[in-house]
Every structure is written in structure tokens, then in C-alpha cells.
């Protein structure tokens, strides 16, 4: 069953960008053209800080757990950390496998880049790691005060990447699927690591 799930996820990631048509460029063009200093500043802030948030949260959890000698918090930090790092590594591999051109490069007359990226477009690494962070936190702490901010955060990251002109809708959808999928895999990996490190 797990093999079939992995097959369908990989198939989705390879085929989706190939099937995407001009509707994606039009959607990015629409979002990319939103006016106002708030949306510009908010989007820029979310995009620039996402990698630091994704890595910083599990590191802070680990530091606090170590200082307080809280083994459960250390286990949680390991789960969140492996989810984020594993997702990022997988996303980078898929990026160069698919090698999709960025929206602002493919449609320079239609989409204005608010930021510039050097790697390929699909999937969105920012969205993938944000979803990995949010999903792992929600699995470990299934409370409304964790779930609600997490949902707002991942939505903001996904939208900001399209506003910046650096991703298509299927890029962020692929990133979201990858983040959730890798986190589920990390859930089982962290169980094995916990036995080796803490038991």
C-alpha cells in the first residue's frame, strides 16, 4: 500500500507541471499584480523568513528540551526537524528532476518578479518545508491554537510565492503534497530514531 502511495505521489509530481497550461500563468499574473504596500511587505517578509522559521522552530524545541531535560520535547523536536530537513532535501531533488522554468522567466511580459530564485520552479521548496513544519506540529500538538496559526502560515507562504512571481499554483500544490507526505514518512522514521537515541 505504501509503495503504491509513493508511486502516485511521484507520478503527480512529474506529470502535473507537464500538463499545466496558460491558466496557471494567468492566475499567477492576477495574484502577482495585487497592489498595496501591505501585501508587498507581508509577502516579502513571509518568503524571506520561511526557511529560518522552518529550521528555527525544531532547533528552539531541541534547545528548550535539552535545557529542561524534557525527553518528550526532544523527541518532538527530532520529528519536526527530520520532517523539515527531509522534505527540503526531497524537494530539491524533484526540482532538478522536473527542471521547470520559473513563471517570471517563462512569461516575462506577463509576470513581474518581486524576488528572483536560481533553482527550478517545481515544487515550491518554501511551501513544502512550511507544510512539513505545520503538519508535524499539528500531529504532535493537535490543538486549535496550533492548527489555526499553522493553517494561516502555510496559506500565507503558498500565496506569497505566487505573489512574488516565482511559483505556479501546481508548484505550491506539489510542495504542499510533498510536505505532508514526507512528514508522514518522518513520523515512522522518528519512531525508529527515538528507540535508538532515547530508549
Region locations from a protein language model:
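Positively charged n-region of N-terminal signal peptides that target proteins for export
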Residues: 1-5, 48, 143
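N-terminal transmembrane-helix/juxtamembrane module of multi-pass inner/ER membrane proteins
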Residues: 12-59, 92-119
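Membrane-helix interface segments
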Residues: 38, 71-75, 142-146
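Short helix-capping/hinge motifs at transmembrane helix termini and TM-loop junctions
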Residues: 67-69, 98-99, 164-165
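Small-polar-interrupted transmembrane alpha-helices in polytopic inner-membrane proteins
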Residues: 82-96, 148-160
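Membrane-embedded catalytic cores of phosphoryl/pyrophosphoryl-handling enzymes
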Residues: 109-199
